[in-house]
Every structure is written in C-alpha cells, then in structure tokens.
C-alpha cells in the first residue's frame, strides 16, 4: 500500500486547492446553496453543515462533528473547535475508509491529536501512531524497524493530514454554510452554557457585548470612572470564568508531613503542556469525594515545585485542617478565584470620583487629560545627590532625578540595563529626606517590589515590606524587611510573644486568645508602619486595610508600564501630592486577559497615555548590561539611537567560550533553521523540533566551555516550545541532566527586567501560509534582544520572519554584518539568503483606531488571550520607521472586497491557535496563534500533507 507523503515533499494538489479557495473568496459571489428539503445529517459539521463522511471528524468530548475544511478561518473547522473548546480527542466516521477509529498513541494510549504523529513502516502498508514525547523519544530503542527521526505530526498547517481525513473540495465548500471566524467565536462561547446553541442564536443581538473605549481626554471624573469600571467588570468576569474552567476531577495525591507541616503532592500533566500555570503562593482548594473518610475540603497554598518532574507540585495544608492522610484517590482540585484586585481597583475609582482630596488637583487634572501647566515644587538645592550604599550616578540619571524632585508628576523611562532601580532608590532617598514624610513605593509585581526594597535598605532608610496575608508563608530575599516578620519578632516573655509561641505549639488558639492575639498583632503592625519612612508593596496591596490609617503624599510606581491604569490608581488615591511613574513603554505592557477589553483600551498603561498626552519622560541613556554590539540595533530601532554604552567591548568578551561567533569581536548571530512549526500538545501554542535541537546543541557547547548553567537563558514566545525544549535537553543532551535542569527556559514576559550572560532566542514560527503571530510585537522583540550581557543567539527561519517589516530590518542588520549564518554548528557559514526590498508600509489609521487594531493583531489571540498592544510613541526618524512597520498591520477593510474584508476582520479578531506567556501572568490562560501578512511557500519549507491521490491508510498500529 502506498504510504502517506513524507514531511518535506511538495504537495502541488494542496497548493492548487488553497489557490482555488482563495480565488473563491475573492469572488464576492461566494455561492451558497442551501436545500431546505434535505434534513441536516447528524454528522454534519457543526460550523458549516458539510456532511461528507470522508471529510468530517467527531469531537469525542462534546459529540459534535466538524469538517477538515478551512472555510473562512485559518485553521480547519475541526482544529478550530479543538483549540477553542480545549478538547483533546477525535473519532473518524464509521463509514470512512478507516471506520470509527479513535487515533491514539501505540505506546501510551494518549488520544491528544496535537501530540500525535505517525511513523511510516519500512516494509508494511501500515503506520504507527506515537505521541511526540516521550514515546517517540524512546522509539529507536525498540527493534521494530521504525525510524523515530521520520516522525511527523497528524496536524500540520492547522489541518489534519488529508490521508487521515480528507479536505473538502472547492465545490463542497461552495455549498457549505458560510461562517465567519467571529461567528465561530460567539458560537463556541454559547456552547459553554447551551450545547444546543446554533448560528441563529449567534445572530441574536443580545449576545453582542459592547464595551466603552478608553479615552485620552475625559470630560468629567464620572466619565473616567464609568468607562474604567465597565472594562474592569468585563475583565473580572472573564478571569473568573477562566479559573472555574480549570477544575480538575478525580486526581491522585500523595502526602508528606515534616516539621509540623502537611504537604500534599499533586500531579498535573497540564503544567507541562502550559494549560495550567501555577506560581508560589497561589491558592487552591482540595476536596475529598471518596468514601474512605468524611467529606473533607481545605484551602491549600502552592509551596514548591518538584525538581524531578515538571508535572508535580507540592501544596501546604493550613494548620487545623486535618487532612485524610490515608486517602490518595478521589480528590477534586479547584482553582480559587479571588476578586481582591478588581474590587480594589473599583474602590480606587470610586474614591477618585467622590473625593477631590485623595490626590493633588494637578495630578487629578493630568489623569483626566486636561491641558494644565504643571507647577514646579520648591526644593532645597542639594550639594550632592550621592546616596550611601548606592553607586555614583551618570549624567542622565542625575538629570532625571533633579527634574523629578521639583515636579508634582513625572515619568522616568528606563531602557534595558540603564540602572532604573538604582535611580529610583536614589530618588526615593532624596524625596524622603527633602519632604520629611513617608513614601509609598509600588510595582505591579512582587519581584520588582523586592528588588527596590533591597536597594532602599542599603541607603539606611527605614524600609518596610508589606505583602498580602497569603504570601506571608513565602520566603524572599527581603523577608527580614517584611511587616509580618518584624511584627512577630518580639520578646518571648511579652504577651504577644507568649501567644505566638502558644499558637505555634498547639497549631492554633482558642477564641479568647485568638481575639487577644489579633488585637496585639494589629497594634504592633501599626507601630511598625507608623515608624517606617518607606513602605514597599504591590499596587494592589497598597489598598490593604492595614494602610487605611495613613496618607502617602509621595508615591513612586516602578514598572508602571506593566500595570493597567486602574491598577496604578490604587496607590495614587492614598493622598498623593507628588507622583513618579518609572517604566519603559518600549518594553512589555499590561496583561489583559479579555481581548475585547484589551481592544477597548485597558491594555494602554497610564504611563503610555501620559506620554501620548505630551508629558515628556526623562530617559536614562547609559546602558551597563550589553556588549556594545548587542545594544546597537535596540538603540537605533527603539530608542532613537540615544543609548550610550557604559561598558566596553573588552569587558563583555570571553575568549574561552567555544561558540563559533561569525565575527569574534561581535558575540551575536542569527542562526538560520528551516524546521516546520507544529501545534503544541495543549492545542493553544506552538513548538519547533528543529529549533529545539539547535538550542540543545548551543546550550551544551556553552556548558562544555565552562559557562555556569545559571548564566544561560533560553527565551521563547511560546509555552509549547518552552516545554519541548526542557524535555528535549533532558532526553538528548550529552551533559548530566542536572546541568540542563538549571538552565532557565522561559517566555519574554518572565525575562523582562532580568539578565543572563548568554541568551538563546528560539523564534519557533516557520510555516507555509501563516504569519509570525505576536513575534511581530516590537516590544516583545526589544525585551528578548536586551537580556544578554556577553552573547546573543537568535534561532529562526529568516525566509518567514523577513515578511514582517520589523524582523526584515533586524535580519538585514545581521546580514550586513555577516552575522546571519546557517549549517552545522561545527561548520557555520554565511547564509545565502537574499532579501528584497522591505515590505511596503500601508496608510495608517488614526492613532486611537491603530491602537485598537494593534491590540488584536499585535498579540496572539484565540479564546483566552493575554494582550499586550504595541506602543505608538514619540516622533523622530526611528519612531516614524516603526510606525510605518505597524501600518502594514492596519489595512482599511473598506478598501477591500467583502471576502477580503471578512478575512481581514477574522485576522484581527480571531488569530487562530497560539499563546501563552508565563510566569508573570496574573491569571491562568493559554493563547492561540495569529495570522498577518501571508507567507508564500518556500522550497525548503513545504507542506507535509499527503496528496489527495494517496490511498487511505487502512491500518494503524
């Protein structure tokens, strides 16, 4: 029997089919024939109604049928449904050539179609289905005549291989019911509550949710508050629904007791795939549903992650919740949703509306976008701005501090490696000394707050770190500064000390002692807070009731560009008279889970809005992190060429590191890889096996050269690639496994604000007909390129990436310097790829309209999409070039045919199958990919689809 086409073979039949379908959509006739006389078949596609048994598959999770045709989406209908619904098992039609087969792994039985692939037999007319990992990793060890290197996924280019389930013909698709990507999105949302919902329900206007858009200028405080409250409410509902959908049932646990603590170990395979993300301190609920003990439930807190398995996590059970230690099965796990941050944002908005004294009038006017003259604040001339415990400042840092000291509202822009934290600490020191009042220092993340608190402690200021009650059990580098630790550090023979000892000994207190304990502890905490000069906490925790008794005339918000505007408002309404926002609007912005809310403008930070209103940020201009050659492109592209180097080339070169840099004095290169991207096991992300293999080889070379594992970082935009790279290094790396475990593989988001000696970036995206997704986000690229100190290697497919204007200029930069290479790592040679003229920018929309479009296109989005929109910044040659780049993503649908317009709207609203980010997301979510300028097939990047003439496979192993 003829075998299916192998990966790498060109498939002209598929190309012709796609061409015909494209031509069909460009033709506005787009015929659709609906025969009301014929009843709809039970196995008809739930989207388009196509009912050819050879072209449909059944989703076994919901018992709905879907076809393998694209229609007006960038994925086939069955793949689109699996991604949106997070379903992971399919079945062929009983009348299809393969019968009612459920594809599953021959070795482990996994039925996840995003994980499955096939190996062709050498002598038999059969194929073996194996999951990508771990089963295919071990396939070569079986003496069965199978070659694991020939493994290919069942889904490529977002459609099932045509030898498994046929792709409908052009004629069939013409007769199918037309359905847009937006209709599919709404239909999937309706199915969550009503599995019988139809397209007729989708067309009901009641299901359309209209959200107000944020403005730059507000007429009144009431208008400002109402708009933001509606957006917060929509985001809150979306976030809550995400958490509720994560409930895990019938899980197995293991118990561990030591040092008076009870830990429960839970195995969650979804941790590895990225479908579930947990962080230290996250709250969950564990429920026992079996019959071996009374019904039991308890809140639990994530305490640590396994160093051996990426799927196991240990959670701590609170004292007093006696766990059923003899039970290991029949448990449910719920993800506790807390709306604390949302309620605090709403309270801050209400306070802004009701109390004009909650902040200085000039700050209030600036927030409303009113045109005001910002008055100067009288300051005593300081002979020296030096601060004990901190390094001397450079000219741009000194200039920024001098300007900020005399202004009621200021912005400081800190590009990568420019000493933003040191500058902030110096500024805080002088503000506290000059104003002789306490100061509130905030950031959206605990990591940023800890870093700033540590620097401030060195200056001799009385610093107190306030954390939420749920994080008090977690250790950090500044735990000794925390309020809860200092409050507990009392004389043992004091009344509070006695109660603390009694509580620890007995695991709790009686009601009378508990009341005394709380009163004494609150008094102790008040004394500490009142004595502090600087209180450091997150933006959300600045509304902690323990701070209600205090006013904070001085407020500094670090990483302000990563916080939403209502989040920044929480500390500002605590009586702010002088406000400093520190951040970088050319790096990552706020995380917004609901893409509709993002499009409405909530993903634009307060810092960015003030820049657009004309508030000029004070920019730090000397970078101390990167080798000068590494900083050249980011400086020219993102900072108007203004970044200066505070380190020399000699200080950032290591001659003993055996990486074959194309130019030894320039430790950087773009390593051309042509491997195809694949959808990850979660169905919502991407991976690239060829690039993962290159990552392992490069990491191994660095380790062998003596580079410490902790000084190597691997950055990838995709959670699927992150997990695959980690596993690939463990299975295939030639060094000891512990060395690879210490290598940090993470997202761009996780690396923001951090650095490593050597950074490897794996781009992942490599396809025939799709775009590069949120790789086109300029801020994401900026962060990825600016994490390395001594060396940077970017791995990707230049033929695909160069279709994007931003990446085109990046690749030309490397090509012109002979830094774009290909071949084996031991024999690198300059790449022969030739670039044509840059992609032609198209006419831009208005700034506000562009912002909304970028919110949709600049980030990947499927169903649960954390959105970071690209920034439209200040004027200048470099900025104008960047705006031109973004213009390619903002076609005006009115100038297109209806079919093209539908396609474009689908691109903006639906990006079909991708995403994530990681550590740092404040909510569980995965994301699904994006599609921009179409990439034409290259000879080296061809489809793995079987030809339509290939006989159907009749046997699986």
Which ranges hold each PLM region?
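Cys/His-rich zinc-coordinating "finger" modules and their low-complexity flanking regions
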Residues: 1-175
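Pre-ATPase regulatory/linker segments immediately N-terminal to the P-loop/RecA-like helicase/translocase core
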Residues: 6-7, 136-215, 220-227, 250-252, ...
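Short, charged beta-turn/beta-strand-edge "cap" motif at the junction between a beta-strand
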Residues: 51, 71-74, 289-294, 542-543, ...
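Intrinsically disordered, low-complexity regions enriched in proline, serine, glycine
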Residues: 56-58, 68-71, 75-81, 114-118, ...
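Hydrophobic beta-strand signal
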Residues: 66-67, 285, 760
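ASCE P-loop NTPase helicase motor core
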Residues: 300, 321-324, 368-485, 515-521, ...
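Conserved helicase motor core of SF1/SF2 NTP-dependent helicases
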Residues: 434-437, 445, 540-941, 946, ...
